[in-house]
Structure formats: structure tokens, C-alpha cells
Amino acid sequence: MKSRVLLDSSVWIEWLTKGKRLSACQKYMDKSLIIGVPSIVVFEVCRKVQMKVSEDEALRVAAWLRTFGVLTFNDELALYAVDLSINFKLGMADSIVLAHAYREDAQLVTLENDFSSLKNVAVIRS
């Protein structure tokens, strides 16, 4: 059985921009495996799209991301993210994304090396 995954904003951006690591990302883009998109990932991806392309395109991307289900952020998850941030020396957004993945028992998939030493994380390098 394939494992459930949570994609970091870096993977969504790589997918949308058809970046050089797109082929390595594709195996994780199976909608049946993706547990949802954290609301902070929607923010990060749409901010990038709006800055680089347009607000209209960012709204289209947000609508598409919603089809995967948006994972909301609450106080319980915030406190869990605080612990992860302190223990692993992660920034706010990274610790929130990791908290979502860990809470849902999903593998975090990312392009960011900051996560490389953490359990249940796949860092796409090529």
C-alpha cells in the first residue's frame, strides 16, 4: 500500500512552474495519496503566483488546491508546531507544515533540505 503524503509548498510550486525537479515530484502528485493542503501552503503558493503572474492566476491556483482539501490550522496544532519548531530549529511555516504531516501520519514531501534529517520526510533532490 502506498503511503499518504503531504506536499510542501516547494513541491506545488515546482509542479506549477514545471521546474527541473518536476519528474521527481510527479510520483507524489497522485490525488488519492495527498491528504490535503495546509492553509499556510495555500498562502505560500498563491503569494508566489500572485507576485510572479497575477491575482487572477493565484485565485485559479487556490481553487485547484482546494480540490485536494484544505487542512486548517488551530490552537492545538499551533502548540504542536511550537514544539517542532524549537526541537528541530524550524521556522514558523515549516513547523506548521510538519505538524500537519505528523498529525495525519503522512510523509512530508519537500524540496527543502531543512527537513532532510527528520523522520517520515522525503526530500526531492533531483
Please name every model-derived segment:
Residues 7-8, 36-39, 90-91, 112, ...:
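Histidine- and aromatic-rich ligand-binding microenvironments
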Residues 12-13, 42, 78, 115-116:
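A generic structural signal for short hydrophobic patches within well-formed alpha-helices
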Residues 70-111:
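Active-site neighborhoods of divalent-metal-dependent phosphate/nucleic-acid chemistry enzymes
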Residues 22, 42, 58-61, 74, ...:
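A general structural signal for well-ordered alpha-helical segments in protein cores
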Residues 3, 32-35, 67-69, 103-107:
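Short active-site oxyanion
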Residues 1-37, 50-60:
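Short, well-structured N-terminal submotif of metal-dependent ribonuclease cores
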Residues 2, 98-126:
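Acidic, PIN/NYN-like endoribonuclease modules and their adjacent C-terminal/linker elements
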